[in-house]
Regions:
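Active-site-lining helix/loop region of Rossmann-like oxidoreductase modules
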Residues: 5, 127-249
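Generic detector of short, locally flexible boundary/turn motifs and exposed helical patches
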Residues: 32-34, 58-61, 83-86, 114-116, ...
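Metallocofactor- and cofactor-centric catalytic cores in central/energy metabolism, strongly enriched
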Residues: 1-92, 97, 101-111, 226-250
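Glycine-/Pro-rich loop/turn segments that contact NAD(P) or position catalytic residues
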Residues: 75-77, 81-89, 94-168
């Protein structure tokens, strides 16, 4: 309930007490330049190797079975750190952000060799922007039309969108989302004819995510058509409904 968290589905007074503890871990590249003034990790001065040893000890002592990563977009080093921790402790890994672990052949093979569940990468909401875009793109393709251009623009007001103002952190995110749509098409679009990704941070939107999507193409007799969709969802509830099933599967 502390800022900058925006999840308030249950009234604070109705939330039961929890026994979970918060432990320090290396921040690595987990905090981007746009969120530095909102998120200040507590750092004890311990080295990465010291913290790693402490983390492994806690995981073993608590009998942890699954690690769920909701690290900020662009946390490549931090994601690899936790993936390796999972391998070293035989812990399942649910990667909810677009750093390539499950979809990387080398990393995936490491998990396969040790028979450790790995689920990811990234996450599609229950009725989220990308799954809607994928479904409509596939529909147009299956109905025999020729998609010529498409875009999907997402805006929101939580720290996820604030973090994504840093373009350097978006490389894997845009690849993940763009490929998700391209994979539904019989004929891939040229890079200049497809755009899928976050557009901007609008503070007053809070946890509300808005998606604007457009598909342009041609149907029978080479006649042009287009469609536009506006989607409004609670960004985190949309995500949580899917990751719960991923945890059950792991």
């Amino acid at each position: 309930y502390e800022s900058p968290n925006m999840v308030n589905w249950i009234d604070k007074n109705d939330m039961p007490k929890a026994n979970g503890n918060v432990y320090e871990s290396p921040a690595l590249d987990g905090v981007g330049i746009w969120v530095e003034n909102k998120v200040k990790p507590i750092e004890s001065g311990k080295s990465e190797s010291e913290l790693r040893e402490e983390i492994i000890k806690v995981l073993e002592e608590t009998g942890t079975e699954i690690i769920v990563s909701y690290l900020p977009v662009g946390s490549e080093k931090a994601t690899q750190f936790w993936a390796q921790v999972c391998l070293d402790t035989n812990t399942a890994f649910v990667n909810c952000m677009p750093a390539f672990i499950a979809s990387d052949k080398e990393w995936a093979q490491k998990f396969t060799d040790k028979n450790i569940p790995i689920i990811g990468d990234d996450i599609k909401g229950q009725v989220g922007a990308t799954i809607v875009h994928r479904t409509l793109a596939r529909l147009c393709d299956e109905r025999g039309t020729k998609i010529e251009k498409t875009y999907q623009i997402n805006v929101g007001g939580n720290t996820d969108f604030l973090n994504m103002k840093e373009q350097e952190r978006l490389v894997s995110k845009k690849i993940s989302k763009t490929e998700s749509v391209q994979s539904q098409l019989t004929d891939r679009l040229d890079d200049d004819d497809i755009y899928v990704g976050p557009s901007d941070f609008i503070p007053f939107l809070g946890n509300t995510k808005l998606m604007f999507m457009r598909i342009e193409g041609r149907q029978w007799a080479n006649i042009p058509y287009n469609m536009e969709v506006r989607l409004e969802v609670d960004d985190k509830a949309n995500s949580a409904g899917i990751v719960i099933d991923a945890i059950r599967l792991a």
